[in-house]
Amino acid sequence: FETMGYLSQLYIQMGETAKARELLEKMAAMEPHLTSTFLTLANVCFIQEDYQAMEEAANKAIAIEEGNAVAHYLLGKARKGQNDDLMTIAHLTKAITLKDDFIEARLLRAEALLNLKQYKEMMEDIDAVLAQNPEEETAMLLRGKVKESNGQGEEAEEDYKLVTEINPFNEQAYLYLGQLYINQKKLTEAIGLFDEAIELNPNFAEAYKERGRAKLLNGDKDGSVEDMKKSLELNPKEEANLNGEFKNLGPKSEALPGIF
């Protein structure tokens, strides 16, 4: 059994999630009283984006050990994957009640609260996280989103820029800052920022997409099409979203040939 556990961890590290999951499911059947097996299984299901199976595994862990904060966190994460913000918040609140300094749970709850525009409650989580770690990047980005939502664009920009300075490889910071520039009609700044992001990571699909959007708004249709095509090449799942981006580009044949 111990060897199976080591092997499942090795599969996870190698990215062989299907093999890891198969092994963990066998382990769960052999020793159905071990919380750790179900927690690992839930994490593997998360990697596979199988949120219903993740929820089942987390629930089984809770049935074994009701007071396990990580199990409640994973259950909240599973509901988040199914776009159920209310139940996400409920499960994460339970996790935080069990473990008050649970940074990951507070950050995930803050994201769900952002979706519901519950900014006051969201800031309570963000402040609690930043009190533990003043340079927690996700907390700073979420604080920026609150400021942006409240019409404080300059203050939001400061938060986003600060994160890019702390960690130049934080891609979410570039996306938030670039999207803010686009909303503010600072299209040249947005394009320049995404140039920088793509230089740091030439496979940054979202940066190509957002740069394409900025170029389109700036009147550069050809450049926009090239960026959108590159984004789609890097992330084929985005095809439906890209179709929407080009709805104002005239005949489909002039927009992105081959994907419509």
Regions found by a protein language model. Name each.
Residues 1-18, 22-27, 33-47, 70:
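A generic tandem-repeat structural signature
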Residues 145, 149, 161, 169-185:
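Alpha-helical adaptor scaffolds
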Residues 14-26, 48-60, 81-94, 116-128, ...:
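Structural signature of tandem alpha-helical TPR/SEL1-like repeats
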Residues 6, 40, 74, 108, ...:
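Canonical tetratricopeptide repeat
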Residues 1-2, 35-36, 69-70, 103-104, ...:
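Helix-start (N-cap) detector for alpha-helical repeat units in TPR-like alpha-solenoids
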Residues 217, 222-260:
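Terminal, low-structured helical/coil segments at or just beyond the last alpha-helical repeat
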